Amino acid sequence: MMGPEDAGACSGRNAELLPVPGPMGQDGKTVPATSGFSGGAVAAEPPEEAGEEEAPPPRQLLQRYLAAAAGPLKPGLGGAEAEEAAAAAVPAARGSGMTNGDSGFLLRQDRRGPEEARRRRTCGRPCLLEPADEGVDGAGGLDDWAAPLEDPLRSCCLAAGDTDDPDPAAATPAGRAVESAEPSLGLPDARFGSRNTFEVSRRQSAGDLLPSAGPSAPLPAAEQGPGGTTARARRSGGFADFFARNLFPKRTKELKSVVHSAPGWKLFGKVPPRENLQKTSKIIQQEYEARTGRTCKAAPQSSRRKSFALEPLSTTALILEDRPPNLPAKSVEEALRHRQEYDEMVAEAKKREIKEAHKRKRIMKERFKQEESIASAMVIWINEILPNWEVMRSTRRVRELWWQGLPPSVRGKVWSLAVGNELNITPELYEIFLSRAKERWKSFSESSSENDTEGLSVADREASLELIKLDISRTFPSLYIFQKGGPYHDVLHSILGAYTCYRPDVGYVQGMSFIAAVLILNLEEADAFIAFANLLNKPCQLAFFRVDHSMMLKYFATFEVFFEENLSKLFLHFKSYNLTPDIYLIDWIFTLYSKSLPLDLACRVWDVFCRDGEEFLFRTGLGILRLYEDILLQMDFIHIAQFLTKLPEDITSEKLFSCIAAIQMQNSTKKWTQVFASVAKDIKEGDKNTSPALKS
């Protein structure tokens, strides 16, 4: 079965319309049909005969259409009779037409002769409508009872009156002799994949090809409806509307509702633009409030900030739940007790979190205050102090700023100026010793077999090279910048290797890597090497790194003098356990507290160390003991040694420097240098009542 769109598109050749047999009468003759099979715009006989017989029901019309599409005609219509009936149907179908929106066929009067019909039939193109000839059946050119086409879109014509018989004698007689007959219907030979099908289906209008309709005669009263509308006008919906109206009413309503609900969607033709209104957040909120009846009020800014600062972020995920269904339910007393315990736990958790929030807030305020002071101090250092270094370095104002800590942007410069360059090392000299170190590293593996027969100094130097590689990997391991593959690994290795070539009498000692690493973080490579070499050339560092026992003994004895002066109770506690200063001071002095304290705090210790010299190193040690005095008094020997070799990581600079400031580096009007000189004299005279670890 062919649909409206299929029947409306003709194939390559013009097929003949098959005559549709009408209902048979009692005398064996065909009863003329009153309308087309669509119930619409096609009338097969003059209007004066329309009222004589009722129109067949839609089911019978559909059966006729299917019978015509099936092929052979009903019995009773032979070949000649079919031809005569087809020829007689031409004048009646002259003025009536149907579009492909109705049934896919258009019936018109054939005014061609046999030769013209045959030529048109074999032309290979679809037969389109032609303009009507003037003066036929009235002034209008069409029959008076014919109605114009209702829908001219995508129309095509199927000719009637020609047969497939090539014999001219069997064809319809030439001219227009027959005036009334039953219309002949048939199906086109539609090839759905052809180009013609596509072209015909895309036709937008065929108004210029349709014959002009003349004035139609009024129908009898039987055909008139209320308001003067004709039955043909009421049934002018077309063949598709016939199926939708009689067979698929629900489906049609659904389709119409879909079309109305989605105006932006159209299956064929141009799609109209859909309205796309951008809704703001305010409009969305208003729609939500109107739909739910709720109003969303934002909290004030001040309250949100206060709750963020003071309210706990969580309740440590404490959730009170009932027992699983497979276990016995709680009793009322047990449920109340659990609820009370839960409330107490949540309250404690909130108190703890509020306390931590206050602590974090206090730390942030202190850090912010410190950053502001550093920013203001940086301007003073850059614009006033550094340009006039030699004049202002000893002034009271500069010393106070120095005590508060150097800004990181000027720290390296101030360190270089404070340490000085008594050794007169230049960047070119550093390159020379660095090249020597590289040559030694290169020849180390090649000459390893010859080192057994050489002197002790060569073995010590080789041991220093191996120790450098091992010690670099343990330098600030939490930063991951000095280990192999880090950005400062090669720089640290170069500085330490160049120093072993520059001072072969000292070589490399464990702890040097931390000092060099701190300098690298604040200075360029050549400047870091210059500061490193001059810093290790100081008397205290040189005594410790060269492991000069006598000098180390003097420093320990001087430290104990000020220890007893400032922390007498803790000093006696250490004496009771025979705990000497060398147990904890060696590590602090070797690394200049860079390993024992946090890095930022160690840098601040270095700031004042560059101002005050070696005295501040021992004063810092006394400040640490004062900070943890109460804890150390409760410990024994083992725990004291473990605690002092690994200090707590939460130590703050404010607490430490407040304790350092409380240490008085005077003993009976004697300062550090005077006490150190007197202790050195006593040791020289043989009084060695000091650390037993250094006695020989």
From Swiss-Prot:
Transmembrane segments: none annotated. Residues 1-59, 91-121, 156-234 are annotated as: Disordered. The keyword Acetylation applies. The modification Phosphothreonine is found at T669. PROSITE patterns: TBC_RABGAP. SUPFAM superfamilies: Ypt/Rab-GAP domain of gyp1p. Keywords: Acetylation, Coiled coil, Endosome, GTPase activation, Phosphoprotein. GO terms for cellular component: endosome. This is TBC1 domain family member 12.
